[in-house]
Amino acid sequence: MSVYHGKTKKRQMLEVDKQHWLPQQVQVTLHALMGAAKEGLLALAVAVGLDVLRSMMEAEVTAIVGPKGKHNPNRKAFRHGAEEGRVVLGGRKVPIQRPRVRTKDGQEVRLSSYEAFQDEQLLTQAALERMLHGLSTRRYHHGLEPVGDDLPAVATSKSSVSRHFVAATRKALAELLARPLGDQRYLVLMLDGIEVADHTVVVALGITDDGQKQILGLWEGATENATVCRALLTDLVERGLRVDGGILVVIDGAKALRAAVRDVLGARATVQRCQVHKKRNVLDHLPDEARAWVSRKLEQAWRETDYEKARTALTSLAKTLDDKYPGAAASLREGLEETLTVLRLELPEALRKTLRSTNPIESAFEKVRMASRNVKRWRNGQQVLRWTAAGLLEAEKGFRRIKGYRQLPMLSEALSRHAAPEASSAVQTA
């Protein structure tokens, strides 16, 4: 057993000796890091990071005033002790002794190495990412990377985290509302609303001519009314949204949205009603025992590859519903032809499946709901907008090209054909 311990001690000495390959400025003793190592690799990394930062600051001081203990008659500054400072590491502020330097006339010399680690944008971004992934302000410190038991931390209180999160979401909202849209050709515009507390936020998602999805804007109101929808669309146009070559607008079926599209975008917009919303609206007028077969009939009609056959099937279904369920029949007839726009444009199946509904926005809404599930009190519309914008932009990071994007030139051509006669008709009328 004694031999075993002897070998262990010898092995530890060899491990310590291996540090000699490191540059002198970044050498750290293993014994000083053993405690941090117990907290895991992240704590070890923070400990090493602090040690490297100390070496960097010392190197910068030496570059300014010269080596310690060596007289330099030409130096313009001198060492002035040290004081406690704070740097940002691991999503919080941690204390560190920072060296001070003064000029001959007593002016403080700022150390760039120290200031680089004081950037509070790192805290703001850390707060944003953690809270968007469901961590509440009260439990924020539980979600931080370990930095070691012997290292105190600040800027992790509920109020501090909340301030940083507000700053981050305010910035996200401002950037989203200021996005220029004139540099891209958007073939598709999807519009849908999400309810947050007593507020409704109408969101616009665009699909470019190469199949990329992008959040274009959002507008808040008490309901999904025409004024709110018109304001959103007007904002998009003012930021450069082009519809001169035609654009497919996929909407959830709200009359306010339909009216706003007509008023702002005019004849250049070709409207596709969301089939998912339409089915939901029709089924809401039916008793449970009738929903299954009506749902099957709707899906069969929408799966048709011929526009006239699909239209005939839906019209026939509406007649069947007339006697027993007139509310469902009326709901189906309202905007019936616009649920078939992707068929009328003769788009291939892959594109039809993608553009038949507002599901791409709905998937982004799920991210907003997940991110904001811990919010217990909604104070105002600005708070709702900030959270929604931040959640949407987080969802946008995971966006992929739509299925069928290689067939988008067919959509572009179809939209141009549709927009041209409408535009010439409008000119003749004028």
Please describe what each predicted stretch is.
Residues 2-7, 63, 69-70, 77-80, ...:
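RNase H-like nuclease fold core
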Residues 1-152, 159:
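Dynamic "connector" segments at or just before major functional cores
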Residues 279-306:
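Conserved phosphate-handling catalytic cores of large alpha/beta enzymes
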Residues 50, 54, 58, 137, ...:
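Amphipathic alpha-helical transducer elements in NTP-driven molecular machines
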Residues 267-284:
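Inter-helix linker motif
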Residues 1-36, 48, 54, 58-62, ...:
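Acidic/histidine-rich catalytic cores and adjacent linkers
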